[in-house]
């Protein structure tokens, strides 16, 4: 297969998926233990992540730094229609100037400000998918 054909085929697949967002629902968890099984699954070979999104690292960071700074867990897990996890956002919630703000766990110490992704979803995610994710999260806030 030539490179142009491979790119064209991949683009066609992505466009077919983009007519409707693939993130059907989100869970927002306030407890790391409740997120651990999905989180560790997204650390597997089918996922895209960095060492800075690993459960063990961020659990330790939250216990030492996050807790001292008054941060609460705000773990977002996005699921497809079969309840298969597509992504996990390891976020922390804080109060700032009267507003609730979320940011990636790790703060200024260790983070690339990114989610853990199912590899296939990450490779083909569209703006429709991400806009849908933001809409679903906003319904929980």
Name what the model sees in each region.
Residues 1-141:
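N-acyltransferase acceptor-side catalytic subdomain
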